[in-house]
């Protein structure tokens, strides 16, 4: 990943006297206010330099005029404090919430297209300290180091432990400087909620405000929200409570599919950046990845590509993201000493769906036995049941059911449904 790849953001909730926010350590809770739109971005520069291009109006109106994150991805100890202070100060003057991306962890992207970062963890901590000085106590939402927790395949056990310690220290340092800190949760098609909860716990999410998901990715907001609820439940079961989610919606308004698909014309920008999510578990929808900046597949990572931007700025693809939703309800149909039988009803929303997937969390030592009407997988305490070949496609408002036998105490789980 690179400044604009699938990684995360440092959302900076700035404050100024008499404005929307106050300085000092940001308290836990939902965010309010409008995000800061930086005037000098690659998209804005391209628009200014190409007034007569047929693509300019769409890129200007739908992308350049929207707030997106400012990435801190160049490791330079001589300039980073001034860069942060200037950006935070401009946002504070405007009375807006700035969004930053801290992307400087050593061995970032596991040496992939967005490789780079600090030379070692000691230098990284110095870099973080300078960023904290740049914040200067001004309330700042920080989404810390995209992919740093979800992507660990290139690290040894000792290196993972050292990275976790560095992230934990960074979170505490930035929080003490006024930061509202979010850690990397990957996305809904990556690690299970149970696995990601274990990783977040090891990286110190107890001392952070929450987690972010879908950075530089294309998964639907509905899928990410369902994943977030499961992750919050998994954290709660580990005694880590009060955490909330931020979702990158910059490019999730159309097709998902293969991540490394810069030329996928079915992809679209998603929900505009906002803190008004209508969901107590979700603090914000943010454009962490600036639309139009490449991932390092077909084009150089981080480079602005007008063709990509114009495609993303097009009309929502068919079907749009918010169609094809589903809901799930649970009931216990029978119970006995040491076990019970449950049934889940899946209902399609206002549009047809091609398939569905229901997820819930086991409690009290429960385990799943036989399942009928669906295909079950378990990961730790998380159960996921997907449709069979014959009951996945549902008309608007139509229903399907599956049942299961389980051992353990009877409970009424919170079941979530996402369309496939």
Stretches found by the model and what they are:
Residues 30-134, 138, 290-305, 309-312, ...:
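N-terminal carbohydrate-binding/catalytic regions of secreted carbohydrate-active enzymes
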Residues 322-338, 349:
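Low-complexity, acidic Ser/Thr/Pro/Gly-rich terminal tails and inter-domain linkers that flank the onset
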Residues 327, 396, 401-420:
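Terminal connector regions
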Residues 352-379:
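Short acidic, flexible loop segments centered on an aromatic residue
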